[in-house]
Amino acid sequence: QGLLYVDSTGSRFFNEELTIDWPQASNAIARTGEWTYIVFDEATKREFSTEGKGYPNPCGNFIQRHQAATQLDALLKANEAKGNVFIGNTIEEVAKKAGMDPATLKASADMMTKFAKQGRDDQFGKDKYYLRAVSEGPFYVVRGKLNTLTSLNGVKVNADLQVLDKN
């Protein structure tokens, strides 16, 4: 919730607070295509690594609520080697590494920093508790795919999960 989500162009596309509610988040994220990107700066990484944060489900099992993510540096480095994390000293550098337009990602980061400083999200109305500046390098971009964690309705099945209707 406290992190900036962008699409493959570097544009912020929804209120990240919705990640608390997976069905709503999934619908917003699905429109971005195959990949979604989470962007944060060194100050946020340091806070998660040393203090933890009280966000509900900040990154599933990756970062636990109210617990320091002492493994965060190692996880970022390991996933950088796999091509799922990009690290750059400037927002433009990390954008290029992630294949995004540097000006677009910079505009998204600058806008989020402005919202964090003013305590109000003028774009999507995210609660001020979750607003985080993206201004202190190095910068991190984590690439992820949408996973379906819940479903609404679907096929009718019996107690053995056998489909009841051929349609």
What do the PLM-derived regions correspond to, one by one?
Residues 1-97:
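An anion/pyrophosphate-binding glycine-rich loop and adjacent beta-alpha core
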